[in-house]
Every structure is written in structure tokens, then in C-alpha cells.
A protein has these predicted regions:
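Bacterial Sec-dependent N-terminal signal peptides
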Residues: 1-24, 435
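Residue-level detector of alpha-helical transmembrane segments in integral membrane proteins
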Residues: 9, 57, 270-271
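Single-residue recognition of alpha-helix boundary sites
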Residues: 13-14, 74, 89, 184, ...
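N-terminal, post-signal peptide beta-strand-biased segments of exported outer-membrane/organellar beta-barrel
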Residues: 17-125
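Outer-membrane beta-barrel porins/channels
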Residues: 20-44, 110-435
């Protein structure tokens, strides 16, 4: 038990160190950042498939109703990390970037009969980008040069994290429901600088900052119906409450004289600037004899009516206010499955899990009035049993994931990610007979 607590504390501190390196995407400059997958190790092998799954030896926090299925004598601790390589392509200009991230730390145990409890730490979104462009200003009127170049530099960092506590209860066989309550916190920092080669033209900087601290509520239910002696079907439903985050955002507009270094700063602030969307999920999972599980998930995030801060106008007419037209509703469809010949078989490969999944996610960002990137992704994964004299219930989950984000006239992203998750399944409260 002490080892588990120490591991959890160490992983928690490590997550804080890696949290801001979870993305290199320029698209993380919009909204709350690049939205995190939030799936655990076994889900990631199926590309995030989750709503209809309830496992006795895995933590599925994406539907809290599943906690009721956790083994009565087990304590499950699961932590995962990812390594990713991303290729960015804009008009034939290609750049590669790589980064690593601790993705999640979750745990679960049986509290009472038919009642499971889970808690954990995971990212909600990531902000991390740094890019620039340079152009000529043709025939720019200037005392020092007939032609001037200007450059725009964009950078950002931060993200949102959440720690949650949840419970799931099965009041009667086949039906369960549960809830997670989370504390959501983090900072969003974004910086834009417009500078000119002509020293007579001021450099303009726009620094946007926000600090968010609020709650998040998720609810879930599952119903399992036996079709035959070997086949059953599970319907999973989830709902996440959308609400204002009661957080302010600030913008500092800085004009700097390139010759004298003298700056003039104008400060703007918007109260209650950010909001979480209402989110609905529905999933169906077919289970054949606990060997083959195939499922489909659909998720809807209601972003369309959410407002977002916008700086507009020039000079004394500059305004910083909430505006619409930045988002669309986000739809995600996932299909995947898991095959294992049987956990009680003696053969090593018979006890392995083989997983696969594919997803399509519709654009939810509006960039310069046009639809942002849509996302295609696919994954393959395995669950490798850890067998030794002390414990044969733990699992090493490894998966490979490909993600493509693209939109007409915008940057194309191709990301290859390796996910590694280690699920410790510790046997608690067992009575041992001494001869």
C-alpha cells in the first residue's frame, strides 16, 4: 500500500512538470486549448471507446457507472504516458515536432457491495505552440525605407487539469449509474507580437492571460441485457454539465517604440469569460463470452452557442468583449473492439488483449469564418499480462495511435503517438489460511 501511495504522489508531481508539453499544435491557440483524449490505457487501444465498457480489472472513468463492476477484493492503480511525433504541413512547408506527456493517473476500488469508487488526475486541455510568419509591405511609406517587412509571432502555453472523485452503484443486476465531481484548474497564456523592420514603426504586442478554477460534473449510466447465454449487449449513456467557469481573462495591448524602447500599455479585462459545453455521450457494446467485445460510441459537445473573448478595432475604438461565431457543435464517432481468448488460460498469448479502434471528429472551431480542422484517427493496442509469483492480475497496456487534423487552406497535422499505461491490480482485504 505504501508503494502505491508513493507512486501516486511521484506521478502527480511529474504530471505537473509535463502538463504544458502535451501539444505543439497551433490549433491550441483557440478555445480552451487542444482538448485532451482523457482515455486510460485500455481505452486508448480502442481509440477512446468507453461508454459501454465495464471492466472488473480496469478503470473506465469516462463512464462512472462502470465503477460498480470493479472486483470486490481489488485496488486498481493505473498510470500512463505518451510519446508523440507530429508533422505540420502548410503549403508544402513541413516541420516536425516531438513531445512527451504523462496522460493520466487513476485508481479504483470496491467500497461496498455493488458500489465502486474511483479518483484520479488527468489533463482536460493543453496549450503549447510557437510559430511566426514574415511578409513584405509593398511601397510602405517610410522615411527610412521604401519597402518594409513585418513579422507576426504567436506563442502560448498552459492548459487545464482536473482531479476527480467518483462513485458507481449497481442497485440491481444489469443496471448501474454513477457520477464524477472534478476540480478543474489551470492557466491559459497566449502572446502575439507584430514587429516591423522599419524602426519608425512601433511594435505591437497582445498578451492574453486567464486563470481558471472551477468544478466539473459528469454523470453516467449503463444497462446490460443478456441476449443468449454467451452474448450480452450494454448500453451506456453519459452527460457532462455545461456551465460558466466564473473566470476572468485579461489582455494587455502594448505599443513599443523601437527606437526609444518606451512602451504604452492598455489593459482590458472580461469577467466570466469561459464556459464548458454540455456534453452527451451514448455507446453500445456487444460482449461475446467475455472473449470478444465490440462497441461504438457517439459524443456531442454543444460548443456552438458559447462565446469567446475577441479584441477588435484600432486606437481609441479598440474593444475586448465576448463574441459569437468561434465554435460549432463537435461530433465524434468511434468504433473499436477488444479480443482476449481468456484471462484464466495458462498460455501467455491466450491471456493477452488485442485492441483496435477508429474515430472521426467533426470541426468545432471557426477560424476566420471558415470551418477548422476535422480529425481522423486510428489505433492498435495490446494488453500484456504481468505474471509473477506475487501478482498475475496487473496489465501493461501499449498502443500506437495515428491522428490527422486538416482543413482547406489551413495547417495539416499528422501525429503518431505511442501510449504506455501500467495497471497495478493489488489484492486487498483477502483472508489467508495458515496451515
Amino acid at each position: 500500500m505504501k508503494k502505491i501511495i508513493v507512486s501516486a504522489l511521484f506521478a502527480g508531481f511529474a504530471m505537473q512538470g509535463f502538463a504544458q508539453s502535451g501539444t505543439n499544435s497551433p490549433y491550441s491557440q483557440y478555445g480552451l486549448g487542444a482538448l485532451a483524449t482523457q482515455a486510460t490505457g485500455f481505452n486508448r487501444g480502442m481509440n477512446g471507446l468507453a461508454y459501454g465498457f465495464h471492466e472488473h480489472n480496469q478503470v473506465n472513468h469516462m463512464n462512472p457507472a462502470s465503477y460498480s463492476a470493479v472486483d470486490s477484493l481489488s485496488f486498481i492503480f493505473d498510470a500512463g504516458l505518451s510519446l508523440q511525433l507530429t508533422n505540420f504541413d502548410e503549403g508544402g512547408h513541413k516541420v516536425n515536432a516531438h513531445n512527451a506527456d504523462i496522460e493520466y493517473i487513476v485508481a479504483s476500488f470496491r467500497a461496498f457491495k455493488h458500489v465502486g469508487v474511483s479518483f484520479g488526475l488527468l489533463p482536460y486541455s493543453n496549450v503549447g505552440y510557437n510559430f511566426s510568419n514574415k511578409r513584405n509591405v509593398n511601397a510602405f511609406p517610410s522615411p527610412s525605407s521604401p519597402s518594409t517587412t513585418y513579422s507576426n509571432t504567436y506563442s502560448g502555453d498552459g492548459g487545464l487539469h482536473q482531479v476527480y472523485l467518483g462513485a458507481g452503484w449497481e442497485p440491481f443486476k444489469g443496471f448501474s449509474f454513477g457520477a464524477n465531481i472534478s476540480y478543474l484548474w489551470g492557466t491559459l497564456n497566449r502572446y502575439t507580437t507584430n514587429s516591423y523592420s522599419d524602426s519608425y514603426v512601433n511594435t505591437i504586442s497582445r498578451n492574453y492571460t486567464a486563470e481558471i478554477k472551477n468544478y466539473k460534473l459528469d454523470f453516467g449510466t449503463q444497462y446490460t441485457h443478456s441476449i443468449t447465454k454467451k452474448d450480452e449487449l450494454t448500453l451506456g449513456l453519459t452527460y457532462s454539465l455545461g456551465h460558466k467557469l466564473n473566470s476572468n481573462t485579461e489582455c494587455n495591448l502594448i505599443s513599443t517604440n523601437s527606437q526609444t524602447g518606451v512602451s504604452d500599455t492598455t489593459h482590458y479585462m472580461i469577467s466570466n469569460a469561459f464556459e464548458l459545453p454540455h456534453t452527451i455521450g451514448i455507446g453500445l457494446m456487444w460482449n461475446h463470452n467475455n472473449h470478444l467485445k465490440i462497441g461504438v460510441d457517439y459524443q456531442l459537445q454543444k460548443w456552438a452557442k458559447i462565446l469567446y473573448p475577441r479584441l477588435s478595432g484600432t486606437g481609441s475604438a479598440t474593444t475586448f468583449a465576448l463574441a459569437d461565431g468561434f465554435f460549432k457543435d463537435r461530433h465524434r464517432l468511434t468504433l473499436g473492439g477488444d479480443y482476449c481468448r481468456g484471462e484464466r488460460y495458462r498460455g501467455f498469448f491466450d491471456r493477452m488483449h488485442y485492441r483496435a479502434g477508429v474515430s472521426y471528429t467533426s470541426p468545432y472551431l471557426k477560424i476566420n469564418g471558415a470551418d477548422g480542422p476535422r480529425e481522423l484517427s486510428a489505433s492498435l493496442g495490446v494488453g500484456i499480462p504481468i505474471i509473477n509469483g506475487y501478482n498475475n492480475r496487473s496489465i501493461l497496456n501499449i498502443s500506437a495511435e495515428w491522428v490527422n487534423q486538416s482543413a482547406t487552406g489551413l495547417i495539416k497535422e499528422n501525429m503518431f503517438r505511442i501510449n504506455v499505461g501500467l495497471t497495478f491490480n493489488e489484492r486487498w482485504f483477502a483472508k489467508f489460511k495458515v496451515e
